[in-house]
Swiss-Prot record:
Active site: residue positions: 517 (proton acceptor)
Keywords from the UniProt entry: 2Fe-2S, Amino-acid biosynthesis, Branched-chain amino acid biosynthesis, Iron, Iron-sulfur, Lyase, Magnesium, Metal-binding
Pathway: Amino-acid biosynthesis; L-isoleucine biosynthesis; L-isoleucine from 2-oxobutanoate: step 3/4; Amino-acid biosynthesis; L-valine biosynthesis; L-valine from pyruvate: step 3/4
Name recorded for this polypeptide: Dihydroxy-acid dehydratase
Family: Belongs to the IlvD/Edd family.
EC primary class: lyase
Gene Ontology MF: a single term: dihydroxy-acid dehydratase activity
One Gene Ontology CC term in the entry: cytosol
Biological classification of the source: Bacteria, Pseudomonadati, Pseudomonadota, Gammaproteobacteria, Enterobacterales
Enzyme nomenclature, EC number: 4.2.1.9
Native source organism of the sequence: Escherichia coli O157:H7
Cofactor note: Binds 1 [2Fe-2S] cluster per subunit. This cluster acts as a Lewis acid cofactor.
InterPro entries reported for this sequence: Dihydro-acid_dehy_C, DihydroxyA_deHydtase, DiOHA_6PGluconate_deHydtase_CS, ILV_EDD_C, ILV_EDD_N, IlvD/EDD_N
Length: 616
């Protein structure tokens, strides 16, 4: 029978000092012996996805204490990728994932907590907490802050839905008036919550459902809706049950590594492909799998991408649907239901509620359930009122979207595409693969060949795009922006957005060893591995080289002979200490970022730290 970890600090005469300190936090004799559960919050006023979380930890804590546990809350950092975008701040985004994972480990292990409730939401916070949860392998439940309502505004006598990306594109489009740009900017992000499309934050919060570590509705129920409060209340109660099951009944099925098994990871990736999720999810799932010691690789993702269709299309791939529409159609469980009926899921998995996949679908799939309360929950909709407050409205759609032929979520027979929303490409400068969000690629450019325009920083590429130096037919290559080369693997949302602003969204390709925002669409190929800074062949591309992209056949090829590439590699190596570094880039790199870069692996490994360099 496992012993409560917290007993290390609460039992025995030699722990008198620790107990004295616990008493100073409000604990009493009656609490010594109860499970201590960490409420891992991520409130910050910097991030709209987290600005409403200040009091939500208290909600969870009250339920933990009522159920017989002791709740102790702490906070992690949270970087807003949208605010950090387009300048040096983006260098810090991906490295913050490792800091979050480490800080959770530090706090939980230093104080011997028995279990966790993770209150996450945005881009690197959910992955960081997920990595920590699987590393620690103690009972955990995720409950995120929820999606933002879609922005809405009237343009050309028509009400259109908006998000952050629309503000970026219009702001850079010289054809858009100042007044229209200002109107879109003021309307794009109306409420608290994670940005309203299927961007990285919402993609990851959906995937926690598929992994079994969060409750149904977690990924899609709006941050502003009063129904979301119940997820927090349930999490507080349920974590005590899971904790006691493990420590008092020796039930290891309560542990996250047994819930988020390889089968669950495959289900999560299947969901991701079907819903056209952010390419960043690939990076984060690979990293989380390593923490769980699960053999889940780019090869597994490639195999799944070849057989899973696209059953859901959401912004930025279309303006028609946002997360509020996904929820109305049944949310994550609605998509999983269609995938299950198509025979594409592993059914022998359980979630934190103790339900198998068939049981979860029977109870929560709007196409199957007889539970009116569940149907009512999925009718939770937007209010259209600007707010930073959680649970501030109770509006509902009149009906569910259960149209699986023409609605937001489709059945297999009516799939948006027989090919899924993500694909892995391989070729002579992406030997370990690269990723493209096919959900956002126009059919006319699924095959594309063009001359390379090579840039060694995102900044130079942006200057060239806005300066008219990139023209239709070009393949923009941005290198030395990988985990090590950046360092920090910046998102390339501004270059892709500005290509659209210049009318080149369907006329150019962009390839990088960096990554893309979940808000990116277009022929945007990222995560090229190995990255340039690790000796990857992307570092050998020269201006004018022809690059052929073939998404249907999963290929990407630099049309340069092997002999020429070998000569270029020899010349690169001859640069000595300067080999595999950018030639003409001035960038101030802090010690913290240099420390990150010294251990960073390429994207095909999840951009995690190279344990072999530490003897691990």
């Amino acid at each position: 029978m496992p012993k409560y970890r917290s007993a290390t600090t609460t039992h025995g005469r030699n722990m008198a000092g620790a107990r004295a300190l616990w008493r100073a936090t409000g604990m009493t004799d009656a609490d010594f012996g109860k499970p201590i559960i960490a409420v891992v919050n991520s409130f910050t006023q910097f991030v709209p996805g987290h600005v409403h979380l200040r009091d939500l930890g208290k909600l969870v804590a009250e339920q933990i204490e009522a159920a017989g546990g002791v709740a102790k809350e702490f906070n992690t950092i949270a970087v807003d990728d949208g605010i950090a975008m387009g300048h040096g701040g983006m260098l810090y985004s991906l490295p913050s994932r490792e800091l979050i994972a480490d800080s959770v480990e530090y706090m939980v292990n230093a104080h011997c907590a028995d279990a966790m409730v993770c209150i996450s939401n945005c881009d690197k916070i959910t992955p960081g907490m997920l990595m920590a949860s699987l590393r620690l392998n103690i009972p955990v439940i995720f409950v995120s802050g929820g999606p933002m309502e879609a922005g809405k505004t009237k343009l050309s006598d028509q009400i259109i839905k908006l998000d952050l990306v629309d503000a970026m594109i219009q702001g850079a489009d010289p054809k858009v008036s100042d007044s229209q740009s200002d109107q879109v900017e003021r309307s794009a992000c109306p409420t608290c919550g994670s940005c309203s499309g299927m961007f990285t934050a919402n993609s990851m919060n959906c995937l926690t459902e598929a992994l079994g570590l969060s409750q149904p509705g977690n990924g899609s129920l709006l941050a502003t809706h009063s129904d979301r409060k119940q997820l927090f209340l349930n999490a507080g109660k349920r974590i005590v049950e899971l904790t006691k099951r493990y420590y008092e009944q020796n039930d290891e099925s309560a542990l996250p590594r047994n819930i988020a098994s390889k089968a669950a990871f495959e289900n999560a990736m299947t969901l991701d492909i079907a819903m056209g999720g952010s390419t960043n999810t690939v990076l984060h799932l690979l990293a989380a799998a390593q923490e769980a010691e699960i053999d889940f690789t780019m090869s597994d993702i490639d195999k799944l991408s070849r057989k899973v269709p696209q059953l859901c299309k959401v912004a930025p791939s279309t303006q028609k649907y946002h997360m509020e529409d996904v929820h109305r159609a049944g949310g994550v469980i609605g998509i999983l239901g269609e995938l299950d009926r198509a025979g594409l899921l592993n059914r022998d998995v359980k979630n934190v509620l103790g339900l198998t996949l068939p049981q979860t679908l029977e109870q929560y799939d709007v196409m199957l359930t007889q539970d009116d309360a569940v149907k009512n929950m999925f009718r939770a909709g937007p209010a259209g009122i600007r707010t930073t407050q959680a649970f501030s409205q109770d509006c509902r759609w009149d009906t569910l979207d259960d149209d699986r032929a023409n609605g937001c979520i489709r059945s297999l027979e009516h799939a948006y595409s027989k090919d899924g929303g993500l694909a892995v490409l391989y070729g002579n400068f992406a030997e370990n693969g690269c990723i493209v969000k096919t959900a956002g690629v126009d059919d006319s450019i699924l095959k594309f060949t063009g001359p390379a325009k090579v840039y060694e920083s995102q900044d130079d590429a942006v200057e060239a795009i806005l300066g008219g130096k990139v023209v239709a037919g070009d393949v923009v290559v941005i290198r030395y922006e990988g985990p090590k080369g950046g360092p920090g693997m910046q998102e390339m949302l501004y270059p892709t957005s500005f290509l659209k602003s210049m009318g080149l969204g369907k006329a150019c390709a962009l390839i990088t060893d960096g990554r893309f925002s979940g808000g990116t669409s277009g022929l945007s190929i990222g995560h090229v591995s190995p990255e340039a800074a690790s000796g990857g062949s992307i570092g050998l591309i020269e201006d004018g080289d022809l690059i052929a992209i073939d998404i249907p056949n999963r290929g990407i090829q630099l049309q340069v002979s092997d002999a020429e590439l070998a000569a270029r590699r020899e010349a690169q190596e001859a640069r000595g200490d300067k080999a595999w570094t950018p030639k003409n880039r001035e960038r101030q790199i802090s010690f913290a970022l240099r420390a990150y870069a010294s251990l960073a692996t390429s994207a095909d490994k999840g951009a995690v730290r190279d344990k072999s360099k530490l003897g691990g």
